[in-house]
Amino acid sequence: MATRHQVRNAVVSLLYAKEMGSEMNDFVSEYLEEKRIRNDQRKFADKLFNGVCKNVNQIDNELDKYLNEYKISQIGTVERAILRLGAYEIMYEAIDKAIIINEAIELAKELAGESSPKFINGVLDRIGKVK
């Protein structure tokens, strides 16, 4: 059974694939099955992925407020996916913000550039303080 961290990792990968223009209809189901994300964890993955996709404009507007000299469109694709997922969970889910931010930092360490964890921590921490 997949952990929530593994689910979030898969959701970041799906958000990345969507951003890169992949056809998502069958891909989401196939990818989650390949990663052995099933049952309750599958529902959690679907909720996160669909929630980010449905609310991406509001999420991006919120992120833009805290990116200082950047816009969300200027951020690397992997970092953007991690930020969107973290911001979605802070804005729309009743999960401890410290857990969400820590998960995002861990995802950045695994998937993104060397300076990304600190950057992602700073942005999500600022969002978490006002939400």
From Swiss-Prot:
Entry-linked Pfam families: NusB
Superkingdom in the source lineage: Bacteria
GO molecular function: RNA binding
Nucleotide-binding as UniProt keyword: no
Record-level GO cellular component terms: cytosol
Gene Ontology terms describing biological process: DNA-templated transcription termination; transcription antitermination
Keyword annotations of the record: RNA-binding, Transcription, Transcription antitermination, Transcription regulation
Functional description taken from the UniProt entry: Involved in transcription antitermination. Required for transcription of ribosomal RNA (rRNA) genes. Binds specifically to the boxA antiterminator sequence of the ribosomal RNA (rrn) operons.
Homology family: Belongs to the NusB family.
PANTHER family per the UniProt record, alphabetical: ANTITERMINATION NUSB DOMAIN-CONTAINING PROTEIN, N UTILIZATION SUBSTANCE PROTEIN B-RELATED
Name used for this protein in its record: Transcription antitermination protein NusB
Organism for this UniProt entry: Campylobacter hominis (strain ATCC BAA-381 / DSM 21671 / CCUG 45161 / LMG 19568 / NCTC 13146 / CH001A)
